[in-house]
Amino acid sequence: MPNQDILDLQPAHIRELQNRYERAMADHGYDSLLIASGAAPYRYRDDQAYVFQGFGPFLHWTGLAGQEHSWLLVRPGQKPVLWLYQPVDFWHANPVMAEEPWLEVVDVRSRQQSGAPELDSPGRLVVIGDPLVLDGVPGDHNPAALVAAVEEARVRKTPYEIECLAHANRIALAGHRAAREAFLAGDSEFGINLAYQQATGQREVEAPYHSIIGLNEHAGTLHYQYYDLKPPRRPRSLLIDAGVRYRGYCSDITRTTAGPDEPRFTALVHGLEKLQLRLCEMVSPGVDYVDIHRKAHLGIATLLSASGLVSGLADEAMVEQGITRAFFPHGIGHFLGIQVHDVAGKPTPSPEDAPFLRLTRTLEAGMVVTIEPGLYFIPSLLEPLLNGPEAQYLNRALIDELKSCGGIRIEDNVVVTAAGARNLTRECE
């Protein structure tokens, strides 16, 4: 059952979206905006379709992630109109719409046809969505400037969106607890995934992204995508990066657990968690997100030195020489919302020293970001250092000892508030 406090925020959310989208339309000279939910394409020479989760702007208004062939019309000063595709079909069931407050401020209509609805006097019409479903639809299709404005309208979350994200964190954390218990009980990656799904009540196809569940050296593959059916003989580590989708909104949480007889790796996990919490505390209006990324590298350097993995170099020198990038190759995080890697995060390119950073903006109240430092033992990144002039600073024996633990990543979902930050993940633990 949805939380009534969340439901009570729905009408104000729709009204705010109406205001934001009306401004975008006015700025670009449009009278009507039609949004397509999209549809899953079929596999080549097959009658099975790919998994479908819906177009971001459609979810922004409705939260209906699995609703194909549906359309939403936005016009200034008028109720939004939602056409839901609900065919008479004995093969499949149509989704049942619960009576909720947002339906009072949206005109919802059922229709049998999958194509775009015919509009009366739309004026200058713009249509956005997957080009595969827009063929033959009148109007301007996906103009770049209007699409950018609509994506910018998603950057600062409404109170409704923030509470949906908070609830998505609560559900996901139940899964993370179950996954940790399954690991400590000796389960396999496959079994841990089942435990996560059971605890979250979410099917794999409903997840916002494929859950990353890596034991031992698999934790060193950043987006490890397979699940071994058998557990390793010696379970040394678990890295699980997994979220849920709630009413269209995603959580994205990562936790790392050391095995019971891994004191060195346990110390690294604890050290990285302390760093991660300090980085979360940096989140505040006016802070350049790139600065958080750079502080993360200095923190990783301190941890490498304290653990004995690297010695004989100052922290700044470790960063300048690229040593920290071999241990921490990805960005510190990204925007979060309807999409896991939410839109409009890079108005400027990633800096040269952070090529994989997905967010390069100055933080503002209402933004939601992830903070996810990592420390990994990835052979393809470490071998060039171990075989180069930097080898004199690296503890090869300790690296070899920890290599089969794979790596560590710790990730929280954080709201930028007027006064600082609200950590949605930690408040639910």
Swiss-Prot record:
PROSITE patterns: PROLINE_PEPTIDASE
Residues reported to bind Mn(2+) 2: D241, D252, E411
One GO term of the biological process aspect: proteolysis
EC number: 3.4.13.9
Molecular-function GO terms, alphabetical: aminopeptidase activity; metal ion binding; metalloexopeptidase activity; phosphoric triester hydrolase activity; proline dipeptidase activity
Primary enzyme class: hydrolase
Known catalytic reactions: Xaa-L-Pro dipeptide + H2O = an L-alpha-amino acid + L-proline
Keyword Ribonucleoprotein set for record: no
Residues reported to bind Mn(2+) 1: D252, H334, E372, E411
Superkingdom assignment: Bacteria
Pfam families: PepQ_N, Peptidase_M24
Keywords assigned: Dipeptidase, Hydrolase, Manganese, Metal-binding, Metalloprotease, Protease
Cofactor note: Binds 2 manganese ions per subunit.
GO cellular component: cytosol
Reported cofactor(s): Mn(2+)
PANTHER family, sorted: XAA-PRO AMINOPEPTIDASE 3, XAA-PRO DIPEPTIDASE
Matches recorded under HAMAP family: X_Pro_dipeptid
Family indicated by similarity: Belongs to the peptidase M24B family. Bacterial-type prolidase subfamily.
Function per UniProt: Splits dipeptides with a prolyl residue in the C-terminal position.
Protein name per its UniProtKB record: Xaa-Pro dipeptidase
Species this protein is from: Marinobacter nauticus (strain ATCC 700491 / DSM 11845 / VT8)
Lineage: Bacteria, Pseudomonadati, Pseudomonadota, Gammaproteobacteria, Pseudomonadales
